[in-house]
Design a protein with these regions (language model features):
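Short, polar/acidic, helix-capping and beta-turn segments at strand->helix junctions
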Residues: 1-150
Length: 150
């Protein structure tokens, strides 16, 4: 998926020496300018990865409840991966994540998906917030910091 421009007047990321600081990433498809809310909003690769975690069951009565948090988690973490790789790094270079949730009950799904991108523990802060831009459909926002080898 294309990186797209930030939704407001800010930088998506800033590299200073070997440090890469990323603004909070949310699950908005930049091409469609739409919040990711279902598995069908993700590429097939993502759906396949999520199936390995027990998501994307094909059962509407299950997927309708699990999809928003799992899909947004994958989208956000994959976007962070894309930003890091564009700067010549890898996800293993990400050492700190600050994760914002509209409802902490979404954390378990996010944590399972995070394991696909960060198999080793990282420095982590988790915060529950009341709202996020651009709409109430946004459930998860993650900012990341990476140390990139020259």
């Amino acid at each position: 998926m294309a990186a797209g421009a930030p939704l407001a007047n800010y930088l998506a990321a800033k590299r200073i020496g070997n440090m890469l600081y990323m603004s909070g990433v949310i699950a908005v498809d930049p091409a469609a300018r739409k919040v990711v809310t279902s598995y069908s909003d993700l590429p097939l690769e993502a759906q396949t990865q999520l199936k390995t975690l027990g998501y994307v069951t094909g059962q509407m009565s299950v997927d309708i409840f699990e999809a928003p948090a799992a899909a947004q988690s994958w989208f956000v973490l994959n976007r962070i991966k894309d930003i890091v790789e564009a700067e010549g790094g890898q996800m293993k270079d990400v050492f700190k994540l600050v994760q914002y949730f509209r409802d902490l009950r979404h954390y378990p799904a996010y944590n399972r998906v995070r394991g696909l991108f960060c198999p080793e523990p990282v420095v982590s802060t988790v915060v529950e917030v009341s709202r996020m831009l651009p709409s109430d459909e946004v459930m998860i926002e993650v900012e990341a910091t990476a140390f990139l080898q020259a």
